[in-house]
Curated annotation (Swiss-Prot):
One Pfam family per UniProt: Ribosomal_S19
Source species taxonomy: Archaea, Methanobacteriati, Methanobacteriota, Stenosarchaea group, Halobacteria
GO molecular function, one term: rRNA binding
Organism: Halobacterium salinarum (strain ATCC 700922 / JCM 11081 / NRC-1) (Halobacterium halobium)
One GO term describing the cellular component: cytosolic small ribosomal subunit
UniProt protein name: Small ribosomal subunit protein uS19
Signal peptide extent: none
Domain of life: Archaea
Function: Protein S19 forms a complex with S13 that binds strongly to the 16S ribosomal RNA.
Length: 140
């Protein structure tokens, strides 16, 4: 599953043959045709009322405003649309809201893909009594 985007020599972002300005001027239905199948299906079946609230809030807020006060959402299944580029979202991970600054390369993914719900555990040394052999380790 590869997304067709690349940065040209001049540093211009393109997504499936369209630059960012073209993508931002397109309607939601036209953008949906360019997205991968799963995200396209999400949009064509109809976004929920909560999705439309986040979309409306994103359209009325500016980049500087969201940098200081990000758009808070529980919707990890919201597809990243071209009009979200430059905005900052606070995506709920199950414990807290984590900031996500939307870059052009994120178009076509879900918001939840950029904030993990589980953290990797780094185990330290076993405690006293954790194993049978550690019962006889002298205390410091």
């Amino acid at each position: 599953m590869s997304t067709e985007y690349r940065t040209g020599r001049e540093g211009e972002f393109t997504y499936r043959g369209h630059d960012l300005d073209e993508l931002q001027e397109m309607s939601l239905e036209d953008v949906a045709e360019l997205l991968p199948a799963r995200q396209r299906r999400t949009i064509t079946r109809g976004l929920s009322e909560e999705h439309h609230k986040v979309l409306a809030e994103a359209r009325e807020s500016g980049t500087e405003e969201t940098a200081n006060n990000p758009i808070r959402t529980h919707l990890r299944d919201m597809p990243v649309l071209p009009e979200f580029v430059g905005l900052t979202f606070a995506v709920y991970t199950g414990q807290e809201f984590e900031r996500v600054e939307v870059q052009p390369e994120m178009i076509g993914h879900y918001l939840g893909e950029f904030q993990l719900t589980r953290s990797s555990v780094e185990h330290g040394q076993a405690g006293i009594g954790a194993t049978r052999s550690s019962k006889f380790v002298p205390l410091k």
